[in-house]
Amino acid sequence: MNCPVPENQLPINEYNKLTSAWDFSWACKIGKLYYKFLLKMQLCLFLFFCICLNFLDSKYETGLYSLILSTLFICLICLRTYLGFRYIYVRLLKSALPYEESSWYDGQVWVKNINYLIKDRLVADYTVLPILSRLKISFTINFSFLICLLLRFIF
């Protein structure tokens, strides 16, 4: 039995599209490559903000401001990526998919057959869930660091 839901709306295809997108693919890196990429991104943002703040005025604590801004951006990037993968994770786990087309069958629901369901749940549990865990840890660490930097800035 073929799936009546359009190919681009199948959760597995949405997952494949998300992992190949340049702004989400970094989260799929494995182990040390993931953390190296995050550190490189943090360093590039830090240097960018240092240069920008130096052009504005030299009375600011450029290093601290740059670190706060780069950490804030990393938190926002992690949060955006987490929300994207979370959406896919929830769709992979669902046993029924709503149609998202604007035609006569809009709003109806297609129940996945057992083959689709097993395949989707395996991808969700063994591929997407570890990505979500890493993103959650990265966000927590960066957000904690951001709070410490803001406290240092205030006091």
Swiss-Prot record:
Give the originating organism.
Guillardia theta (Cryptophyte)
Compartments (UniProt record):
Plastid, Chloroplast
Originating gene: ycf36
Q: Which InterPro entries match?
A: CGLD27-like (IPR009631)
Which PANTHER family does this one have? PROTEIN CONSERVED IN THE GREEN LINEAGE AND DIATOMS 27, CHLOROPLASTIC (PTHR34214:SF3), PTHR34214
Q: What superkingdom heads the lineage?
A: Eukaryota
**Which coarse location class describes where this protein primarily resides?**
plastid
Q: What is this protein called?
A: Uncharacterized protein ycf36
Family, per entry: Belongs to the ycf36 family.
Q: Which UniProt keywords apply?
A: Chloroplast, Plastid
May I have one GO cellular component term? chloroplast
